[in-house]
């Protein structure tokens, strides 16, 4: 499944088409005669955008930021020593604030006798990793800080205190109940802040330099069923940005590299609707923008999978299977392709079967059968700046190398009908497209994973498991 989705992402860049594949059915295309006049303009825009992206995409700082994020993932999220260091602090906070539950309250109705509140805006400690990595020294601080050991490229050695994460929590707070273990009578109420800002600094000669910064905001719309936030019943939206800024380096002739990823993620479990938007910017210029809005049918879909699943693509597949999807991709704020899928589950199944058949050297008739079915459930079109026309698209079976493929094709309302992108683009443009896929696909996927892991760290350094463990230990003392 993951390979199929990665192929789809690759196809997106090659044809400037869509998040999945670029295709439409013939019904309702109705291309106008004016479209033919725009054929050269669309081809010109496509070639120019592919060339510009291929020559200017620079993921150096993203890749470095992703590596630093992986260090924190290993050192913190998967480190039992961090568990040992943070749980006593939870226990202390819980013990300090235990109060009796008021009669007639929601907590009383749930069977709790006592409760304690932990305010994340005031949970500020500095965790400094010991030199041998055996644990953490803990002290109070103005913000939540982590100082860890890591690899110093200057000395090419593992060193103490070469990375520092600073987390600031502020804004409004939402009440959330920690997961309950068994029939405990002590409730732990977490006050989750609406605003988070963070930075990751790396040691350079003489001082710490911020190489990775970001911020995000939680927007929660309570369903009214409870005063406590529940992502399975309440609408939640997360917006933010992560960015890195590497100055020009004389050695190696590295140019200045400022990159940013703007993201927006929302889910409404009542309306069964979800949306995602990612904008990749380089040196203050928007390069690639991905947007998707899904209507899903799974009533029990858990949006928390976004920050716990191994792959963001797996989450998207789980979300839209059996539902519908509206999506778009924009290159250089110029060339935009939009698509509509009325049955995502069927589309994914057909893509999987077609890919398997193609790898087994299926004949033209076999691939044509899949092409026809895909065109019945997926529609797409393309537009670009300065041209007041939308060009309809669909899949067309074409031979590519030794295999038959379902290729995106465009209709410019002339005698040629639908023409596949391999016929429209010159050899150089196709080469640029392959360069983009080769350079961009993996770093972009890594950047999205970094967003997910940062949300996981920021929102769950007080994970349900840790709070539950602290709650159980505190209650038994």
Outline where the language-model segments fall:
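Short, solvent-exposed loop/turn motifs
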Residues: 135, 158-160, 286, 347, ...
């Amino acid at each position: 499944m993951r390979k199929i989705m990665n192929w789809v992402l690759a196809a997106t860049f090659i044809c400037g088409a869509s998040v999945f594949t670029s295709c439409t059915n013939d019904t309702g295309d109705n291309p106008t005669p004016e479209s033919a006049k725009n054929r050269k303009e669309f081809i010109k825009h496509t070639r120019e955008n592919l060339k510009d992206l291929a020559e200017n995409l620079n993921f150096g700082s993203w890749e470095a930021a992703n590596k630093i994020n992986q260090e924190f993932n290993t050192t913190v999220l998967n480190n039992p020593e961090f568990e040992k260091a943070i749980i006593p602090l939870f226990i202390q906070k819980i013990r300090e604030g235990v109060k009796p539950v008021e009669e007639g309250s929601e907590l009383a109705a749930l069977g709790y006798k006592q409760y304690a509140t932990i305010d994340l805006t005031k949970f500020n400690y500095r965790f400094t990793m010991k030199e041998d990595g055996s644990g953490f020294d803990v002290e109070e601080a103005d913000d939540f800080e982590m100082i860890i050991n890591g690899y110093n490229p200057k000395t090419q050695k593992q060193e103490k205190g070469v990375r520092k994460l600073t987390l600031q929590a502020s804004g409004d707070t939402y009440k959330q109940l920690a997961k309950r273990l068994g029939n405990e009578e002590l409730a732990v109420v977490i006050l989750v802040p609406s605003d988070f800002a963070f930075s990751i600094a790396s040691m350079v000669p003489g001082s710490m330099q911020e190489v990775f910064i970001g911020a995000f905001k939680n927007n929660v719309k309570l369903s009214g069923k409870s005063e406590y936030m529940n992502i399975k019943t309440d609408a939640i939206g997360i917006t933010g940005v992560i960015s890195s800024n590497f100055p020009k380096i004389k050695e190696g002739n590295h140019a200045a590299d400022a990159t940013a990823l703007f993201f927006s993620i929302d889910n409404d479990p009542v309306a069964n609707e979800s949306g995602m938007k990612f904008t990749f910017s380089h040196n203050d210029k928007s390069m690639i923008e991905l947007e998707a809005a899904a209507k899903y049918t799974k009533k029990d879909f858990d949006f928390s999978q976004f920050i716990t699943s191994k792959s963001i693509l797996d989450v998207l597949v789980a979300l839209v299977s059996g539902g519908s999807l509206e999506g778009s991709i924009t290159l250089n704020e110029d060339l935009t392709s939009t698509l509509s899928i009325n049955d995502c589950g069927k589309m994914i199944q057909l893509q999987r079967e077609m890919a398997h058949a193609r790898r087994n050297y299926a004949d033209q008739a076999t691939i044509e059968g899949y092409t026809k079915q895909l065109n019945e459930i997926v529609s797409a079109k393309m537009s670009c700046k300065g041209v007041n026309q939308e060009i309809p698209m669909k899949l067309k079976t074409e031979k590519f190398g030794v295999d038959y493929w379902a290729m995106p094709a465009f209709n410019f309302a002339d005698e040629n009908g639908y023409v596949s992108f391999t016929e429209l683009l010159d050899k150089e443009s196709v080469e640029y497209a392959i360069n983009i896929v080769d350079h961009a696909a993996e770093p972009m996927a890594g950047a999205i994973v970094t967003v997910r892991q940062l949300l996981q760290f920021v929102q769950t350094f007080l994970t349900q498991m840790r709070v539950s463990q602290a709650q159980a230990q505190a209650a038994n003392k």
